[in-house]
């Protein structure tokens, strides 16, 4: 039985990769990488996101200046059709991932009831 669980996990991984929503994220990501300005904005977003997550993990909040930078970056991203499409595709994929997470972790949740 223990090997079966890994087979199921690998099957799930392949199924996620086959989802049209996953394929759309890949497609849009490739388009972003092919566009220098979109790629630069995406890299700025990732760097900003990592910085904010690090701050929050250490109990800090973004300063007013950092919040302004975040808003400005968000506006630039919203104005870029490729990045906008990427985040929309990510959102569609995240619906599946949230549902899968809920299903997979249900047995563990039962253990703490």
From Swiss-Prot:
Concerning Pfam families, the annotation shows: Com_YlbF
Per its UniProt record, what SUPFAM superfamilies does this chain match? YheA/YmcA-like (SSF158622)
Q: Which domain of life does the protein's organism represent?
A: Bacteria
Q: Which HAMAP family match?
A: UPF0342
State the similarity comment: Belongs to the UPF0342 family.
Q: What is this protein called?
A: UPF0342 protein M6_Spy0643
Organism annotation: Streptococcus pyogenes serotype M6 (strain ATCC BAA-946 / MGAS10394)
Q: Lineage of this protein's species?
A: Bacteria, Bacillati, Bacillota, Bacilli, Lactobacillales
């Amino acid at each position: 039985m223990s090997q079966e669980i890994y087979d199921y996990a690998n099957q799930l991984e392949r199924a996620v990769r086959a989802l049209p929503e996953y394929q759309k994220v890949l497609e849009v990501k490739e388009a972003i990488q092919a566009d220098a300005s979109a790629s630069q904005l995406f890299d700025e977003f990732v760097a900003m996101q990592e910085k904010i997550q690090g701050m929050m993990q250490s109990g800090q909040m973004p300063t007013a200046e950092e919040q302004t930078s975040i808003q400005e970056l968000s506006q630039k991203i919203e104005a870029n059709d490729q990045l906008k499409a990427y985040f929309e595709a990510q959102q569609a994929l995240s619906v599946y991932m949230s549902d899968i997470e809920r299903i997979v972790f249900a047995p563990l949740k039962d253990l703490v009831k």
